Amino acid sequence: MGVVRSLLLFVVAAVTEIGGAWLVWQGVREHRGPVWVGLGIGFLAAYGFVATLQPDAHFGRILAAYGGVFVAGSLLWGVAVDGFRPDRYDLAGAAICLLGVAVIMYARRV
């Protein structure tokens, strides 16, 4: 159950951080206004709290592993929201990052 909870928290973290950054981008770069920016800031703040819910107690490990989730999640967000089409190098890079997440977070430690 710990791994499932951790993975779900990584997904929530990705949605809050990537979504927050996207909202700020929309507010500033796409001129959608301060409400979008404010919502984005709120989502980004929520991301900071979500990370604290991870079962592992080591901040550095959590953030290092989340970096890989962020890479893959950003590509997925681009596909779903912005019509981005990743090439094979994007996909290979994301796969390598997710492998890193698995090693950092879930490898059996002795």
Swiss-Prot record:
Key words, A-Z: Cell membrane, Membrane, Transmembrane, Transmembrane helix
Signal peptide: none
Bridged cysteine pairs (disulfide): none
SUPFAM superfamilies: Multidrug resistance efflux transporter EmrE
Cellular component terms (Gene Ontology): plasma membrane
Topology class, membrane: Multi-pass membrane protein
Stored PANTHER family: UPF0060 MEMBRANE PROTEIN YNFA
Protein name: UPF0060 membrane protein Francci3_2786
Taxon lineage: Bacteria, Bacillati, Actinomycetota, Actinomycetes, Frankiales
